[in-house]
């Protein structure tokens, strides 16, 4: 199973979706997006789920559980927390940390985590039962092999009554 934690507004959520969906299509595995709903506690890193205004595949599931990764993906979640802590303590948040993330990617992918905050870092599925994607994935290289499908799914749902889009009912 491919899991991806959503963060940010609609634009960031679209990139997370594109990465996870492309990986799921490539690996022929189901995809579940985790909406941690941490905006409810005032976290600046996440806003409300916004993907429902797009033609998201019905094959992609959503979980709204702040503790899902910690509870069900403990190895991946612990590795993610260590990466964040290391980047904060090493001062990498203040400069380009992509080289560090790229060096760590093979080991993290092997245990079922892909951690990417900036730039393109190739992802490999690895042998872990579950795979957690965390980051922003802001690059077309993450989904170039599935670009036609992804682009079609990221189109807004048209609603003639409102002139442009509205959330799906």
Predicted segment positions?
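Secretory-pathway luminal glycosyltransferase catalytic domains
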Residues: 45-169
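N-terminal pre-catalytic "stem/leader" segment of glycosyltransferase-like enzymes
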Residues: 1-48
């Amino acid at each position: 199973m491919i899991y991806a934690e959503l963060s940010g507004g609609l634009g960031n959520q679209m990139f997370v979706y594109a990465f996870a969906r492309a990986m799921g299509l490539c690996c022929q595995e189901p995809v579940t997006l985790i909406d941690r709903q941490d905006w409810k506690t005032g976290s600046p890193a996440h806003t409300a789920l916004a993907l429902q205004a797009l033609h998201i595949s019905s094959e992609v599931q959503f979980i709204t559980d702040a503790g899902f990764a910690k509870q069900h993906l403990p190895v991946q979640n612990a590795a993610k927390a260590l990466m964040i802590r290391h980047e904060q303590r090493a001062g990498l948040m203040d400069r380009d940390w992509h080289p560090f993330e790229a060096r760590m990617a093979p080991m993290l992918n092997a245990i079922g985590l892909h951690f990417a905050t900036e730039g393109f870092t190739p992802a490999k599925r690895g042998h872990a039962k579950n795979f957690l994607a965390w980051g922003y994935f802001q690059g077309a290289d993450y989904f170039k092999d599935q670009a036609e499908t992804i682009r079609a799914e990221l189109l807004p749902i048209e609603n003639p009554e409102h002139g442009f889009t509205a959330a799906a009912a």
